[in-house]
Regions:
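Conserved, structured core segments of small domains
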Residues: 1-137
Length: 137
């Protein structure tokens, strides 16, 4: 019996202006290609889910829990959506990212490994023992 370890990755789709200047027919093709890609990855057991995000939201920050508008949709760096992948390794996640139909139109796909919760616990334990100072390892 073979045991294969799988890893979790997020594909973060950046840029909300990729569709500017597309004709309705071009836009429909991209959306159809995108949905077919998503459904194929789900059928292969590689994508557990994902969603587009609304263009704008709120940002909560700081000790005072300040709420501000943003991030702003016009940014090429704004996160437009995500997929949650379970794949063999980072190389497979990157190969999947390269298949994104939006790349041809200016989208950016960021591939990020999902941290194991135990690494967060280990970091907290190091803080409590004084092994980490100033928030840096």
């Amino acid at each position: 019996m073979s045991t294969t370890t799988k890893s979790d990755y997020l594909l973060l789709f950046r840029g909300n202006v990729w569709d500017r200047g597309l004709s309705p027919a071009q836009l429909q093709k991209v959306v159809s290609d995108w949905m077919a890609w998503f459904e194929r990855l789900k059928a292969e057991g590689k994508c557990a889910g994902g969603h587009p995000l609304e263009d704008e939201g709120k940002v909560v920050s700081g000790k005072q829990r300040t709420v501000a508008d943003g991030p702003f949709a016009e940014s090429k760096e704004a996160i437009a959506g995500y997929f949650f992948l379970t794949v063999a390794d980072e190389n497979e996640a990157i190969e999947i990212a390269k298949q994104c139909p939006g790349l041809e139109y200016g989208s950016i796909v960021e591939v990020r490994p999902v941290a194991d919760i135990s690494s967060v616990r280990q970091r907290a334990e190091k803080y409590s023992r004084g092994e980490l100072a100033g928030g840096k390892a």
